[in-house]
């Protein structure tokens, strides 16, 4: 019985960086990518290179344009939904686990 408790504590603890991602399997996560891309989706699989398979993904791409008259920066966001997406790990900047309330 004590072994079961120890095993459960080991599976829910974060000792290495990839443990945080392991605990987020089958949960919704936020992924910030290079080139001002952001992804929100359900994590189905990942590997040590941060290659990931995400489902029910909402991709947001932010572009900056400069107004020729006022030289002000104009931010534009484009969103699209993707049912299943393979994310190559070398473009990943940040992975945030789901918000846990409680």
From Swiss-Prot:
Subunit structure: Component of the precatalytic spliceosome (spliceosome B complex). Component of the U4/U6-U5 tri-snRNP complex, a building block of the precatalytic spliceosome (spliceosome B complex). The U4/U6-U5 tri-snRNP complex is composed of the U4, U6 and U5 snRNAs and at least PRPF3, PRPF4, PRPF6, PRPF8, PRPF31, SNRNP200, TXNL4A, SNRNP40, SNRPB, SNRPD1, SNRPD2, SNRPD3, SNRPE, SNRPF, SNRPG, DDX23, CD2BP2, PPIH, SNU13, EFTUD2, SART1 and USP39, plus LSM2, LSM3, LSM4, LSM5, LSM6, LSM7 and LSM8.
Record-annotated disulphide pairs: none
SUPFAM superfamilies: Sm-like ribonucleoproteins (SSF50182)
Chief location bin: nucleus
GO CC aspect terms: catalytic step 2 spliceosome; cytosol; Lsm1-7-Pat1 complex; Lsm2-8 complex; nucleoplasm; nucleus; P-body; precatalytic spliceosome
Biological role: Plays a role in pre-mRNA splicing as component of the U4/U6-U5 tri-snRNP complex that is involved in spliceosome assembly, and as component of the precatalytic spliceosome (spliceosome B complex). The heptameric LSM2-8 complex binds specifically to the 3'-terminal U-tract of U6 snRNA.
GO molecular function: RNA binding; U6 snRNA 3'-end binding
Family in the record: Belongs to the snRNP Sm proteins family.
Top-level taxonomy: Eukaryota, Metazoa, Chordata, Craniata, Vertebrata
GO biological process: mRNA processing; mRNA splicing, via spliceosome; P-body assembly
Signal peptide stretch: none
Compartment(s) where it occurs, according to its Swiss-Prot or TrEMBL record: Nucleus
Database matches in InterPro entries: Lsm3 (IPR034105), LSM_dom_sf (IPR010920), Sm (IPR047575), Sm-like_LSM3 (IPR040002), Sm_dom_euk/arc (IPR001163)
Record flagged with keyword Ribonucleoprotein: yes
Residues modified to N-acetylalanine: 2
Segments forming domain Sm: 16-101
Keywords from the UniProt entry: Acetylation, mRNA processing, mRNA splicing, Nucleus, Ribonucleoprotein, RNA-binding, Spliceosome
Protein name (database record): U6 snRNA-associated Sm-like protein LSm3
PROSITE patterns, sorted: SM
């Amino acid at each position: 019985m004590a072994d079961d408790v120890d095993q459960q504590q080991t599976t829910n603890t974060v000792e290495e960086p990839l443990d945080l991602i392991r605990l987020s399997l089958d949960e919704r996560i936020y992924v910030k990518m290079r080139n001002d891309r952001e992804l929100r989706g359900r994590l189905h699989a990942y590997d040590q290179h941060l290659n990931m398979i995400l489902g029910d993904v909402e991709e947001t791409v932010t572009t900056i344009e400069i107004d020729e008259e006022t030289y002000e920066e104009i931010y534009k966001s484009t969103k699209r939904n993707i049912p299943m997406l393979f994310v190559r790990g070398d473009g990943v900047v940040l992975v945030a686990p789901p918000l846990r309330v409680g």
